[in-house]
């Protein structure tokens, strides 16, 4: 507290601009201190990562769940464009310090990885269009198995017993999830017309076909990126920038070639009653992709790579539950058992990676 003399405080004798300057410094210091505390807070990092990844999946599911949705290439092109613009804005604002200038040679080297990314995100969106969020989440675990054996084939080594156990649980959870899904679909179509039953089962089969293709693309992308990233010496922001930038023309050209841009089809995909929420969802998904990348790095920095892997395993449970809550996915003994098995398999795999057993 300022000292007083003759009832007049020392602050009252200072010019107004000096008082304001002192207050600005104090406020700036408190904001910096708060930001530093948040940046190093493990709980905040974990929560931000979980919320960003869960919300991204739910928003994608919402956008592609329209009865007449058939513009996935266009959706992903807009998503990648928004991501590219967001990165450039962050760089211009000084929020990203280590993003270099565009390099044509590096872009040419990275182009095959971007093609794999396009395959991964497109097949992922198509699978999410036909499958429920819990089933999609469970089957995503199969990518881990393909990556593990891909690394054994490319680099050498072997799969340890505990990792093998986790893989067995992942396969079992996927089989149980598929069985429960087919049982639910069969029961739902038993009372429907034959045409409706055939359409429902065809959509389910399409979802599993897209999911299988997505597992292959996802594993190929992860394995390929690890090799090419050593040649380009990219950091996280470089990967995000080139992935988004190079994906835009590929996705846009694909949309122009195979998708219907007529006004009638646009009206069907973006009906008036949900147009605003769909546009907001598409915009959010573009920005959220950048936010997930930041939260991933933040989580690893504030905790450890082992904790991050554990969070990834634990995150599958609330994601599956969120899919049930927001999209009314059927709750049966089979579906719940599959979710629990998938959750346990993730924990066992994380333990195997952290202990090397």
From Swiss-Prot:
It comes from the Eukaryota. Residues 65-68, 129, 183-196, 260-277, 328-332 are lumenal. GO terms for biological process: GDP-mannose transmembrane transport. GO terms for cellular component: cytoplasmic vesicle membrane; endoplasmic reticulum membrane; Golgi apparatus; Golgi membrane. GO terms for molecular function: antiporter activity; GDP-mannose transmembrane transporter activity. Its main location: Golgi. Residues 1-43, 90-107, 151-161, 218-238, 299-306, 353-357 are cytoplasmic. Keywords: Cytoplasmic vesicle, Endoplasmic reticulum, Golgi apparatus, Membrane, Sugar transport, Transmembrane, Transmembrane helix, Transport. It is a multi-pass membrane protein. InterPro entries: TPT_transporter (IPR050186). The chain crosses the membrane at residues 44-64, 69-89, 108-128, 130-150, 162-182, 197-217, 239-259, 278-298, 307-327, 333-352. It is found in: Golgi apparatus membrane; Cytoplasmic vesicle membrane; Endoplasmic reticulum membrane. Belongs to the TPT transporter family. SLC35D subfamily. Involved in the import of GDP-mannose from the cytoplasm into the Golgi lumen. NCBIfam families: nst. Homooligomer. This is GDP-mannose transporter 2.
